Amino acid sequence: MGPRNPSPDHLSESESEEEENISYLNESSGEEWDSSEEEDSMVPNLSPLESLAWQVKCLLKYSTTWKPLNPNSWLYHAKLLDPSTPVHILREIGLRLSHCSHCVPKLEPIPEWPPLASCGVPPFQKPLTSPSRLSRDHATLNGALQFATKQLSRTLSRATPIPEYLKQIPNSCVSGCCCGWLTKTVKETTRTEPINTTYSYTDFQKAVNKLLTASL
């Protein structure tokens, strides 16, 4: 499930800013994550709940290489759209990293209960009342997912909208664009001042750590 490295071959090396973006992507690519997770390439035989926690734990290791997002760096946002990146995998298990959605052409709604079916984990409903370990695990998982969903929803509500014509650009074109035209277009149509969001990786790590403490 290792991420594919971006292909910057078509980028103009005469523009220092694009070179800087390429270097930025290479430094934070999934290659580092692949090497660190080499020994954990196979998922252990765990219960659905423990399996989810195991996946989140692996992705949390990768998150230590994440850097602050630059709203003007479209190349990084395009990298986030690549379905092979750990960020996309994390979205698939319900913790959607949509804090960069202010310049992503098409936004996806965040449901009240994030979908978990894509990774083989059944959706959890209300926390169980039994004092068993399983019920405590369910309650903690629910809390972590609800926390992440609430934070991401707040971020989306504060996201800077982009012009309507940018919404017409297919995601496939965005993720495969290496000519620099889309980068230039987005830079000209998005705000340059810092965007205030409520989502933080520290908060996310606290929520996930609570999950792992209870279930592993």
UniProtKB/Swiss-Prot annotation:
GO cellular component, as recorded: Cul4-RING E3 ubiquitin ligase complex; nucleoplasm
Chain intervals for the UniProt region annotation (Disordered): 1-42
Pathway: Protein modification; protein ubiquitination
Protein name: DDB1- and CUL4-associated factor 16
PANTHER family the UniProt entry points to: DDB1- AND CUL4-ASSOCIATED FACTOR 16
UniProt subcellular location: Nucleus
Keywords, alphabetical: Acetylation, Nucleus, Ubl conjugation pathway
Alphabetical list of Pfam families matching this protein: DCA16
Gene that this sequence comes from: DCAF16
